[in-house]
């Protein structure tokens, strides 16, 4: 059986092993359930208000006040808290990925940082390049610093040939990059999974709503108009929630994937410049 994975190779199973991920999902569900029952399901949102509780009127018989969208969403049924959970998880991990990628970028603009490194390397100013990495911080700076330290060591190593030194420098870059990139793509699989399952959960709610609607039509005599309207409303609300979650999931996944691709390109560009500089200066 195949597993959902993101471009960094992380599967949904790996993501769910994280205590942070599990805590976010559980907390999101509890918040969604609380909002659904206590805020959306508050009797003041329905015709009759507090009298609905006093008269013990079943919640499926409650009728939303005109224009009260909280009550309308509440009538979407028990699938609504699941869809709200999906949205909360999506928002949480979108923010988490944004913070992580911002930290990985470091303190300054990456394009300026890469150009400065290229200038330092062209003039064989290795110490200045290392100092720039310490100032920039972030994943790209970490990779470049590892390469620059190896560069400095190889310059003084007389036991290796030029080709061996170049291979050693390239290997150092590959190892440093392999340590940094997984951090950027971690939990990205959560966003891609939400993009896939949100619309399916919404479809489940749609089916349940239509079952209720057709059940009202199947009654002998005049159909129950209230039950029919409730069923159709439930179906449409779940459809809207499901599509919204899927749409946002796709947008956020593609947005962060593009940022990671751009980040990876800058790492490759800077690494290539360092190797070329070393090859040109090494005799």
Where do the model's predicted regions map?
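Helix-termination/interfacial motifs at the ends of transmembrane alpha-helices
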Residues: 8-16, 36-56, 62-63, 72, ...
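Hydrophobic membrane-targeting segments
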Residues: 7-110, 256
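Long, non-globular segments of proteins
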Residues: 1-2
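Predominantly long cytosolic amphipathic alpha-helical stalk/bundle segments
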Residues: 5-10, 65, 93-95, 99-100, ...
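Amphipathic, well-ordered alpha-helical segments in soluble domains
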Residues: 87, 94, 143, 206-209
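Residue-level signature of catalytic and energy-coupling elements of molecular machines
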Residues: 77, 91, 129, 144, ...
């Amino acid at each position: 059986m195949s597993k959902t994975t993101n471009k960094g190779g992380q599967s949904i199973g790996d993501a769910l092993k994280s205590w942070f991920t599990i805590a976010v999902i559980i907390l999101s569900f509890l918040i969604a359930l609380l909002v659904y029952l206590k805020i959306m399901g508050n009797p003041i949102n329905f015709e009759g208000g507090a009298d609905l509780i006093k008269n013990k009127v079943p919640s499926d018989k409650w009728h939303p006040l005109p224009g009260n969208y909280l009550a309308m969403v509440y009538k979407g049924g028990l699938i609504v808290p699941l869809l709200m959970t999906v949205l909360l998880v999506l928002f949480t991990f979108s923010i988490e990925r944004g913070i992580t990628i911002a930290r990985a970028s470091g303190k300054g603009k990456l394009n300026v940082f890469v150009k400065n490194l290229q200038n330092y390397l062209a003039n064989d100013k290795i110490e200045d390049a290392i100092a720039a990495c310490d100032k920039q911080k972030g994943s790209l700076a970490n990779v470049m610093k590892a390469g620059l330290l190896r560069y400095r060591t190889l310059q003084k190593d007389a036991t290796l040939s030029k080709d061996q030194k170049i291979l050693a420098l390239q290997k150092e870059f590959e190892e440093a990059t392999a340590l940094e990139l997984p951090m950027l793509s971690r939990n990205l699989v959560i966003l891609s999974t939400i993009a896939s399952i949100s619309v399916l959960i919404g479809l489940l709610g749609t089916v349940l709503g239509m079952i209720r609607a057709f059940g009202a039509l199947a009654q002998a005599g005049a159909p129950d108009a209230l039950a029919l309207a409730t069923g159709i409303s439930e179906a449409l609300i779940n459809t809207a929630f499901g599509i919204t979650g899927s749409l946002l999931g796709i947008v956020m996944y593609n947005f962060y994937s593009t940022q990671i691709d751009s980040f990876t390109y800058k790492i490759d560009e800077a690494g290539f410049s360092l190797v070329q500089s070393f090859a040109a200066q090494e005799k």
